[in-house]
């Protein structure tokens, strides 16, 4: 009811070691999903042609990316200010695009709360590699209370201002 589109990452065999090149379309991994917004620092790349062949495994600005296998609970949105217009998600991720009823930033912030993490991880399997069972199906069935869009904008603005202040403080501390 809140999503326009949701899709899994490619099968592992679709991105082999020999597919990586020096520049091109960045491939996301867990280190890129360490906060609310995508961490644009470090990537491996595939060619434009390879990315095109992966179809729905391409994520774009305003999409939200979720880890469904491995380090569970990671969820980040791709901001309009990201370094790249598109990315390829990994085999351990899925991505979704929100419809007009919900801001991707709002939903991402929600899933970073204790309640949101509980909801997200409620169908996790800890046998072997941690994974979300039927990740996209389960995710679509989650019930999330969403305020109206005006209220979402207000909430996101508060959190974004706080997040930006934290980033500045971290940079200051790192330079001491």
Task: Identify the role of each PLM range.
Residues 20-21, 87:
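Extracellular/periplasmic catalytic domains that process cell-envelope and extracellular macromolecules
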Residues 2, 28-31, 99, 147:
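Structured loops at beta-to-helix junctions and adjacent beta-edge loops in soluble globular domains
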Residues 2-17, 31-64:
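Sequence-specific dsDNA recognition surfaces
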Residues 24, 42, 90-92:
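A generic structural signal for short beta-strands and their flanking turns/coil linkers
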Residues 86-94, 125-156:
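A short glycine-rich beta-alpha junction/loop motif
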Residues 106-109, 119, 141, 151-154, ...:
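Short, solvent-exposed alpha-helical surface patches in well-structured domains
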């Amino acid at each position: 009811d809140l999503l326009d589109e949701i899709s899994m990452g490619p099968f592992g065999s679709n991105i082999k070691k020999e597919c990586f090149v020096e520049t091109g379309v960045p491939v996301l991994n867990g280190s890129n999903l360490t906060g609310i917004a995508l961490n644009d620092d470090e990537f491996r790349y595939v060619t434009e042609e390879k990315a095109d062949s992966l179809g729905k495994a391409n994520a774009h600005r305003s999409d939200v990316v979720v880890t469904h296998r491995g380090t569970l609970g990671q969820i980040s949105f791709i901001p309009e200010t990201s370094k790249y217009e598109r990315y390829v998600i990994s085999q351990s991720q899925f991505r979704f695009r929100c419809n007009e009823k919900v801001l991707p930033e709002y939903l991402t912030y929600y899933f970073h709360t204790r309640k949101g993490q509980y909801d997200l991880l409620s169908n996790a399997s800890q046998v072997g590699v941690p994974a979300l069972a039927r990740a996209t199906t389960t995710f679509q069935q989650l019930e999330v209370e969403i305020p109206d869009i005006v209220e979402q904008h207000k909430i996101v603005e508060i959190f974004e201002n706080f997040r930006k202040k934290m980033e500045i403080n971290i940079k200051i501390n790192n330079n001491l």
